Amino acid sequence: MNPVHILAKKGEVAERVLVVGDPGRARLLSTLLQNPKLTNENRGFLVYTGKYNGETVSIATHGIGGPSIAIVLEELAMLGANVFIRYGTTGALVPYINLGEYIIVTGASYNQGGLFYQYLRDNACVASTPDFELTNKLVTSFSKRNLKYYVGNVFSSDAFYAEDEEFVKKWSSRGNIAVEMECATLFTLSKVKGWKSATVLVVSDNLAKGGIWITKEELEKSVMDGAKAVLDTLTS
């Protein structure tokens, strides 16, 4: 089957891909590549391919939420990709994590049903965890660059505006330190499809502190600093 949304050709997408939700972020991070080439812009799913540390990598846009990232991952895999690092933003659920810091994700909680039921074809739950080797490399890369990070589980939500005080208490009490929208899909599909995947998140807001948000300038700096560590990992 050929991709329907990502209209790149085989050979125009690398085996190793940094995936982000925001097309603007994909455009920004492409400046870190040598000779980046825009290989897809259909549907706003920007994909760039270039060199970093002498290795070919791609930066691709996955949009918002589980169904969107599932489509993009499936189509990138059709084009030859099999290693994915999601690099996104997250809302902290615990007060000790500061804005602009990083979370290297070790697992994702999620609600049953929907996309997961359709892929798994029953109500069984797959452990939604990243590739250990890739995650360990991320820890090493972030440590080498002296970037402040936490390692822990997140909750993958399907409803951005359903996050209130009760939500924070519920999911933090279950061992989750942050909330985002795509990790569970990424990790579960990777298990089912035989891909390798991992995730790093930049803390853009803290729900445990009343929903305070990072400034645009501070977020961009943290994103660019962390992206170098992510690309170091992809090319090591």
UniProtKB/Swiss-Prot annotation:
One of its GO terms (biological process) is nucleoside catabolic process. Its EC number is 2.4.2.1, 2.4.2.28. GO terms for molecular function: S-methyl-5-thioadenosine phosphorylase activity. GO terms for cellular component: cytosol. It catalyses: S-methyl-5'-thioadenosine + phosphate = 5-(methylsulfanyl)-alpha-D-ribose 1-phosphate + adenine; a purine D-ribonucleoside + phosphate = a purine nucleobase + alpha-D-ribose 1-phosphate; a purine 2'-deoxy-D-ribonucleoside + phosphate = a purine nucleobase + 2-deoxy-alpha-D-ribose 1-phosphate. It holds the Pfam family PNP_UDP_1. PROSITE patterns: PNP_UDP_1 (PS01232). This is Purine nucleoside phosphorylase. It comes from Saccharolobus solfataricus (strain ATCC 35092 / DSM 1617 / JCM 11322 / P2) (Sulfolobus solfataricus).
